[in-house]
A protein has these predicted regions:
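A cross-kingdom marker for long, charged
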Residues: 287-430
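Hydrophobic membrane-insertion alpha-helices, especially the h-region
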Residues: 9-24
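Extended amphipathic alpha-helical segments with heptad-repeat/coiled-coil character used for oligomerization
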Residues: 212, 216-265, 269-280
Length: 430
């Protein structure tokens, strides 16, 4: 792998940041795309005869778009892909061709020397950052419009959330009393609207641990009372996987295209920006239990959380933090910690393992064996996706655990995380 896989990492970070920008722009009119010198952004380019022949030969697959874009590489400077305030399917097809033309140097480098050859490219992105971000925002707006027009209340609710129509989302949650819609409103609305949805969520799913954890922020009960209710939970369901399955039900303008890549990465950004419940108040009494009954409650909540098998890689860390102050429990939790550490390391490795696939996609080349890490992970949920990829060989599992602990200064997840220079200003973490 090249020492500077920054091209893809920049693409990932840039388009993931689209999610944050999108949340700030919700409900506002579409802003004009970046103007082009010739003012031609209002009309998509029509492919010439050679480009039409390439598309006819390959269709709309990545290799077809790349072939159609090749003649543009002779231009003195690459033409940046152009966006309109409102994009039709034809506009997206033109955007894909123009993206592929701009990425021609990267495509040639990959063809000739693989990832290592990208080192020779100039550091400036071949497609401007603001165009990447604008494309992601446009595609999220397209998702919102498609979902808002559907008949399913859940799909409409996801569309309302993306559109920033908060009052309508809260009204939909209260009218339908659908736990998925109510959970979405509780987790994504703000202020009193979120509090109203959270109270309704707890009413509808009183034994859902995630609903209870969100409710503790608006209902300051004694720690022992909260721990007792959490220990009796029968589910751990944020309904996040359902939301992202709905988001993935809207196909990109063209499968395998640059726009499809931009949409995938924008959804990853939404997933990464999903708010977590505050765990500080839950963990505080368990960091140094003041009594044996309180220590037993902390252990009971940890056991319950583990048994409910959260479909993410973050929540098990809460269980480890709950029992961290009780050394006598460590033997019972060691195998669980090793499993979580192996999966966490596999997740970290997965980022690098899929760099080549995403590099190829960004350069309009078809990956030889697509892994679909972004879309599949969000569709299935983190825990299901990564646990299904754990090696069965004990030695391979041990190697993953060893590497994970090495990155934590030799510490297990059952140990307190290594101190960081900015730990004092960082939020509490398990």
């Amino acid at each position: 792998m090249p020492s500077r896989p920054w091209l893809l990492r920049l693409l990932l970070l840039m388009l993931a940041a689209v999610a944050l920008a999108w949340l700030a722009w919700l409900g506002r009119p579409a802003e004009p795309a970046r103007a082009t010198p010739d003012g031609a952004s209002a009309t998509p380019q029509t492919p010439g005869p050679a480009q039409q022949a390439a598309v006819a030969a390959h269709g709309d697959r990545p290799e077809g778009m790349a072939a159609a874009a090749e003649p543009a590489s002779a231009a003195p400077a690459s033409q940046q892909p152009r966006l309109k305030p409102v994009m039709s399917e034809a506009d997206w097809a033109a955007f894909d061709r123009e993206w592929c033309a701009a990425m021609q140097p990267a495509r040639e480098a990959l063809r000739q020397g693989g990832l290592a050859a990208l080192e020779k490219l100039p550091p400036r992105p071949l497609v401007d950052d603001d165009i990447q971000a604008a494309a992601g925002s446009q595609l999220l707006r397209r998702l919102s419009q498609a979902l808002s027009a559907r008949a399913s209340p859940r799909e409409r609710a996801v569309g309302l959330w993306l559109a920033g129509r908060e009052a309508e989302l809260l009204a939909e949650a209260q009218a339908t009393r659908d736990p998925v819609i109510v959970a979405l409103a509780a987790q994504r609305l703000r202020g009193e609207a979120s509090a109203q949805a959270t109270r309704l969520w707890r009413e509808l799913e009183p034994t859902n641990m995630v609903a209870l954890l969100h409710a503790q922020a608006i209902d300051p009960r004694p720690a022992a009372v909260w721990l007792e209710s959490l220990a009796s939970a029968t589910a751990y369901e944020p309904h996040l996987t359902t939301v992202f399955q709905i988001l993935h039900s809207v196909p990109a303008p063209t499968e395998g295209s640059p726009a499809a890549l931009a949409q995938d990465i924008a959804l990853v950004g939404l997933h990464a920006a999903w708010p977590l419940f505050e765990v500080g108040q839950l963990l505080k009494p368990c960091r140094r239990p003041e009594s044996a009954p309180l220590a037993r409650q902390c252990a009971a909540v940890a056991e319950r959380l583990w048994a409910l098998k959260p479909n993410d890689t973050f929540s098990p860390r809460i269980a480890f933090a709950l029992v961290r102050a009780q050394p006598a429990l460590r033997p019972a939790w060691e195998a669980r910690a090793r499993h979580a550490e192996a999966m966490a390391q596999l997740e970290m490795d997965g980022i690098d393992d899929n760099i080549e696939e995403l590099m190829l996609r960004s350069a309009c080349l078809a990956p030889p064996a697509p892994k679909g890490i972004m879309s599949e992970r969000l569709r299935l949920g983190d825990a299901v996706y990564w646990s299904g990829r754990l090696p069965t060989d004990p030695a391979a599992l041990d190697a993953l655990v060893s590497r994970h602990r090495a990155a934590r200064g030799g510490k297990s997840l059952l140990d307190a995380p290594p101190a960081a220079p900015t730990a004092a200003s960082a939020p509490a973490r398990p």
